[in-house]
Each structure stands twice: as C-alpha cells, then as structure tokens.
Design a protein with these regions (language model features):
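Bacterial N-terminal signal peptides
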Residues: 14-26
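GH16 jelly-roll
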Residues: 30-298
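Accessible peptide chain termini
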Residues: 1-2, 271
Length: 298
C-alpha cells in the first residue's frame, strides 16, 4: 500500500470512528436525558385562607379557639382547664401539670368515671375551633413538637361540625396522635353503627427516637372531594379514597365541615402510666394553617 493510499485510509478511518463515537454518545444522551417536568396542575395550587401563628403572648385567640373543660374522654387522667393553654415566644403551649385538688363534679358512689374520682391529680388543656373556624376540604397543617415520655398523649385532630351528627357518624381524622412510643395517623367513620378505623402506626424509634422528639415537625391533612391524605414531614402516612365512606351511617362525613382540636392528654385508655414521668409535659405548636383551592376558599 502506498503512503498516499495509507494516509487516505487513515483519514477515512478517523472520520468513521468519529461518526460512530458521535452516534454512540447521542444515543446514550437520549437514554439518560431527564424526563421533562410535569406541567403544573392548577388544582395543586393552594391558597392560604386562615392561620394562627400564636405570636401574641397570653391566652389563645378567642376568635379562633375555645376550650374543653373537666374530665372529657377516654378515661384520661387530666382535668381540662383553660389556664393550661397559653402563647409565649411565638408558640402555643399546652402544658400538662401534676396537681392535686378536689374534683368539683365528684359524686359519692357514682358509677360514671368522670364523677366518681374524688381528686384531680393532673391538669392540662384542650382547645377547639368548634363554631369558630370550620372548613370543608383543604390542606390543614401544624408545625409542632411533642413530648414522647410515658403517659403523654398529644393530638391534633378533626371532628365533624354538622349539628345533630354525633361521633362516629360525623367522622374523625387524627392528623397527629402519639402515645406509648408510637405516632399514629387515623381516619374513622361510622359503618353499621360502629366506628370503622383506618390506622397507620409509626414507632418513634424508626423516626429517630429521642432526637426526633426534640425537633419540630409538620403534620398535614390534604383533603378534597376524592381523597384524604395524612402526611408527616411531607411523607404519606395514611390515605382514604372518600368513596369508601359513601355507605357510612348518616352519609359520607368527609364531604361536610370539620373543626380542629389540639390537646395534651395524660394516661387513660392509651397514654400509659405517667407516675414515673417528671412533669410538666408540653405540647408546643408553632402554627396551624389552612390552605384551600380558590373554588373552596372561604
């Protein structure tokens, strides 16, 4: 082969190699090119319609909150009173205290757990937005820090606000509930005159244990005409397709208004024995916010 022919061959081979390399790189780029971002769906755009940032020191805003009083539910040990809920340094604090004072509703030989207790050994608070702030559909969020010691039973939850429709027919959503080492996300409604529960449990040990409990976290309820999702720090905990509740007693409760409850319970049917726990126990809330799509904004 002459030098000229060899030179031509070398040059042609180089061109062929470059062409093959270009095709390979192009094909590889086509394979690894990121998927285009989805077009924004306007139905996923939320508008802030109500909030309580708890920035004013003193009692919670009476335009937003009222109180449960006394012994209320679940055979819990605490006596609910308004003075255990207060705002300080930009936080709502619901404080459970160990106290000892007479039960003003005590009745000798009573068979009712609320009135047969002669003494109050613990006090706390439960605040509720009933008749003040009620919503149908939306994104409900709370940023808070909870005490995970034995006996502590904090919750951020909703109940149905429809007059004359009682629990469980009115529905219940526990956006945040904690007791005995476990965070729960619960949804309940009435079916055949019994509460039908959808419950998801997450041990605090799996979330980070004591270190996790020292931080603030965001609990979310996303609710529209089709579904209800419960999230913790943006991660889905529980989900309900609302059609599943269409056969509920007195109709599907998840198409009707709800109100909020924030409370710090002690002991009772689920909270555990608080006798070895050092008080006070604090449920600290940074804010509660409600977002809605514009069609549902109130």
């Amino acid at each position: 082969m002459s030098k000229q022919t060899k030179s031509q061959w070398d040059f042609g081979g180089l061109l062929l190699f470059i062409a093959i390399l270009f095709l390979a790189v192009t094909a590889n780029c086509a394979e690894t090119k990121p998927e285009p971002l989805p077009v924004s769906d306007s139905t996923n755009d939320w508008k802030l319609v109500w909030q309580d940032e708890f920035n004013t020191n003193g009692p919670p805003d009476p335009a937003n909150w009222n109180y449960d009083r006394g012994f209320v539910r679940n055979q819990e040990l605490q006596w609910y009173q308004s003075e255990n809920a207060f705002c300080t340094n930009g936080l709502l604090v619901i404080e459970a205290r160990q106290e000892h004072k007479p039960n003003p509703t005590f009745v000798t030989n009573s068979t009712n757990w609320k009135t047969r207790r002669e003494w109050i050994d613990y006090t706390s608070a439960a605040i509720t937005s009933r008749r003040l702030r009620e919503f149908t559909y939306g994104r409900f969020e709370m940023r808070a820090r909870i005490d995970i010691r034995l006996g502590s039973w904090p919750a951020f939850w909703t109940l149905g606000a429809t007059p004359g429709v009682r629990w469980p027919a009115g529905g219940e959503v526990d956006v945040m509930e904690f007791y005995t080492g476990t965070v729960l996300a619960n949804i309940a409604y009435s079916l055949d005159r019994r509460a039908k529960w959808s419950t998801v449990k997450k041990p605090v040990a799996e979330l980070g244990g004591d270190a996790w409990s020292k931080e603030f976290h965001i609990w979310t309820m996303e609710w529209d005409e089709r579904k209800l999702d419960l999230l913790l720090d943006g991660r889905l905990m529980n989900h309900l397709d609302l059609v599943e509740a269409d056969n509920a007693d007195q109709g599907n409760p998840f198409h009707r208004p709800v109100y909020f409850i924030l409370n710090q319970a002690i002991g009772g049917t689920q909270g555990g024995d608080p006798s070895q726990t050092k008080f006070p126990i604090r449920f600290e809330v940074d804010w509660v916010r409600v977002y809605q799509h514009s069609v549902n904004s109130q």
